[in-house]
């Protein structure tokens, strides 16, 4: 009874305090109801009571998926140019298959019985066996276990640098030669096989046929790394659609081509970026798994591909060093222009200028192909420690690279960030092709770190014994390759890269058109000149007699004029230290 009276009295006091209304319990109910609704369906709660920011964002066009499964990116801006949600960059390689996969070195297959041997699970005690038979079985098992251990050891040594498998250069007398051979092995390891080239050729041919089927006046051209043989395994393919009449970059045409490719089962994971400065379609070709980017009515990439191939022909060692630097930056996520990294064209320009301005190459003291190791270390030293990013820009003069002060480049003035990389576009002097590489400080640190790592590794292995060198890698200190196991087959000489052939044909056709236009203009001009000459001849015939009558009066002034000319010239000689423009 006492307990009941206490609880009753306490409840009365609470009612008296709130004038007989239990406000506290009502408040709890009001708070709990929206919490339950949010936890059950947050989206409905947001839709009922949107905030001011959400109301503003709802007014903007949203990314959406069309009925045929095409992702339309409406919010892309000029800053998003070059970004790829699958690769992160137009020239950013993806491992094949696309799912993340640990690198596997080429090794002998380990069968189920051998795995059991390694785990010692196959041993069955047989009472009828003699001691000799058991000894033989034990010896055989030990041999098999030893072989398995050797194979596993090889796999461990080559997890991150599989290009050294069966390519031992540890007995080289000069460490620089060891690094040179290892660079060549790496380039051969990642170079395309015949099958890869044929797959890419077939993929482009199929896409081109589909484009021409949709637009008979259009054509598909390849540019970028595939058209120059500077692509890494899994790199995407950059294409451009050009037409006789132009205007294919419109929003409707982007959707039309995307839908057309999807209906023909030539495109999956399709994205249409219509509002960027460079409208583009991104998709994956399902049969090959290759990522493809298609732009419209822009030929500057085709022009750049021709120029780069000329550089490759004239510059020994350019391809090898470019592929090494590309893989180096890719492994560190510094090759994505969208995040401030270095693009493919910028990398090529850096290596090209480095080789063409190297003093020992200019004087023919060294062959670049035989000194790739030293050149790679010096490249990292130049752009990691010594290059003046604050003041110096890279340009070209008569087709050769030059350094010049940033302050004299009016197109990039005013310079907002002095510590930046400035590379003049060889095809457009007003264009800075590296303006998007705002993360140059991290790139410089990476280059400097690579120089330190390589030099330290060279000193370490130089003092090591040949036994300790076995299975070691110099290049592996700065280069990591994680992807599908490959063979050491550079089969570019066995099959033609159609992208290169078609690019060359494009330029030949264009040069013929320009030549024909110039020839037509010259023909019209020469015809007009010939007609004018005949008319002038008929008109000037009568005054010819007057010239004979005036011969004698003109002879005396001629002498005076020659004397005046002589005096004038002699005075100029005194002023210009003997220079006479008339006598040269």
UniProtKB/Swiss-Prot annotation:
Residue span, PAP-associated domain: 371-431
InterPro entries assigned to the protein according to its UniProt record, in alphabetical order: MTPAP-like_central, NT_sf, PAP_assoc, Trf4-like
Annotated spans, Disordered: 1-63, 81-147, 525-584
Binding site for ATP: 301, 326, 431, 435
Keyword Cell cycle: yes
Cited Pfam families: MTPAP-like_central (PF22600), PAP_assoc (PF03828)
Annotated binding of Mg(2+), by residue: 236, 238
Biased composition, class Acidic residues, residue ranges: 130-139
Catalyzed reactions per annotation: RNA(n) + ATP = RNA(n)-3'-adenine ribonucleotide + diphosphate
Keyword Hydrolase: no
Keywords, in A-Z order: ATP-binding, Cell cycle, Cell division, Magnesium, Manganese, Metal-binding, Mitosis, Nucleotide-binding, Nucleotidyltransferase, Nucleus, Transferase
Alphabetical GO biological process terms: base-excision repair; cell division; histone mRNA catabolic process; meiotic DNA double-strand break formation; negative regulation of DNA recombination; nuclear mRNA surveillance of mRNA 3'-end processing; nuclear polyadenylation-dependent antisense transcript catabolic process; nuclear polyadenylation-dependent CUT catabolic process
Example of a GO MF term: mRNA binding
Membership in a protein family: Belongs to the DNA polymerase type-B-like family.
Quaternary structure note: Component of the TRAMP complex (also called TRF4 complex) composed of at least HUL4, MTR4, PAP2/TRF4 and either AIR1 or AIR2. Interacts with NOP53 and POL2. Interacts directly with AIR2.
Protein name: Poly(A) RNA polymerase protein 2
